[in-house]
């Protein structure tokens, strides 16, 4: 069954499946997180460090070996797949002022934070830059190794038009209420894990035509140079709007990218919730046009990862 959903007075109604409409309605009525002032929910390492010993919980999503070799004092180590049950029965989430997710470079924690926020946990944050911002050891192993200017000469300035709206993926859970549909979709995403979430610049630039590429950034940044074929979507006013989302192909792999991979991680979580085969580009623009970002940092307010982002905070074993 198709349902017409009209978001704005100027755009024609978009037909979406009944389950999609119910889930959209439920998320909108419960805070419309992706269009709120707290989206994306990122927190600086310096604030996390200042908050240690206070009423916060740090959840480290890295592997057991990485956690054992060194972690933030007081942090607990949890696998991505364990989080739903941990939040339901392992802790009382709302007794904490903040729950902070930490990963190697802030990419997985951004994706995960969005899912948990959409599930109703409104005090969850992702630590920006991940452990790379905590001290130099992790920066050398993470972000400073990940930045690259490898494809700066492969960018284009063409303004690529969006395709016509073709609806959104059918969710097909067989359920008839927004909350039930959401619960089933969240469970599925956590069961699927994170192995298929990320994509690298090498993969994208080797065959950009294979993907529908979404540039999630300002117009001036997009027009100054972007991945060939990329289509710009506004960082605000895209997610949750069917007239925007319906132009994203449901039958093609989708790559979402921004400056750092943080915002695109949040957006990718939302798109995957609604059935898109979406992937976030690891490190964002930092992973393929880093030198250009550094040179134009002031002119276009880019956010390249530099040594200035790295702190000297201690870890414990």
Indicate where each model-derived feature is located.
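Short hydrophobic beta-strand that contains or immediately precedes a catalytic carboxylate
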Residues: 57-62, 75-78, 212-216, 230-233
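Short, surface-exposed ligand- or partner-binding patches at beta-edge/loop junctions that are enriched
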Residues: 102, 257
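Rhodanese-like catalytic fold shared by cysteine-dependent sulfurtransferases
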Residues: 1-42, 68-98, 107-196, 222-253, ...
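Structural motif
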Residues: 57, 98-100, 212, 253
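A short acidic-Thr-Gly-centered motif at the start of a beta-strand
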Residues: 46-54, 203-207
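Mature N-terminal segment immediately following signal peptide/propeptide cleavage
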Residues: 36, 49, 54-57, 61-62
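A mid-sequence, solvent-exposed acidic-amphipathic segment
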Residues: 207, 216-220
């Amino acid at each position: 069954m198709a349902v017409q959903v009209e978001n704005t007075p100027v755009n024609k109604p978009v037909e979406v499946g009944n389950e999609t409409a119910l889930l959209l309605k439920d998320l909108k009525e419960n805070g419309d997180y992706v269009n709120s002032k707290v989206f994306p929910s990122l927190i600086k390492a310096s604030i996390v460090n200042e908050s240690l010993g206070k009423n916060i919980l740090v959840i480290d999503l890295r592997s057991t070996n990485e956690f054992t070799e060194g972690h933030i004092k007081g942090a607990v180590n949890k696998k991505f797949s364990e989080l739903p049950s941990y939040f339901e029965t392992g802790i009382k989430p709302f007794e904490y002022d903040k729950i902070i997710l930490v990963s190697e470079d802030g990419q997985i924690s951004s994706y995960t934070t969005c899912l948990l926020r959409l599930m109703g946990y409104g005090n969850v944050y992702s630590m920006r830059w991940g452990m790379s911002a905590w001290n130099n050891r992790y920066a050398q192993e993470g972000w400073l190794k990940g930045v690259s200017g490898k494809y700066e000469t492969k960018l284009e300035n063409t303004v690529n038009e969006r395709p016509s709206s073709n609806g959104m993926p059918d969710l097909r859970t067989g359920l008839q209420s927004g909350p039930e549909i959401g619960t089933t979709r969240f469970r599925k995403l956590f069961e699927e894990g994170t192995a298929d979430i990320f994509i690298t610049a090498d993969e994208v630039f080797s065959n950009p035509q294979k993907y529908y590429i979404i540039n999630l950034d300002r117009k001036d940044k997009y027009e100054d140079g972007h991945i060939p074929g990329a289509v710009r979507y506004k960082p605000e006013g895209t997610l949750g709007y069917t007239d925007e989302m319906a132009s994203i192909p449901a039958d093609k792999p989708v790559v979402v990218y921004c400056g750092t991979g943080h915002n695109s991680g949040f957006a990718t979580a939302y798109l995957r919730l609604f059935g898109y085969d979406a992937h976030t580009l690891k490190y964002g623009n930092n992973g393929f046009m880093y030198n250009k970002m550094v040179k134009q940092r002031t002119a276009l307010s880019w956010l390249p990862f530099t040594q200035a982002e790295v702190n000297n905070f201690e870890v414990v074993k």
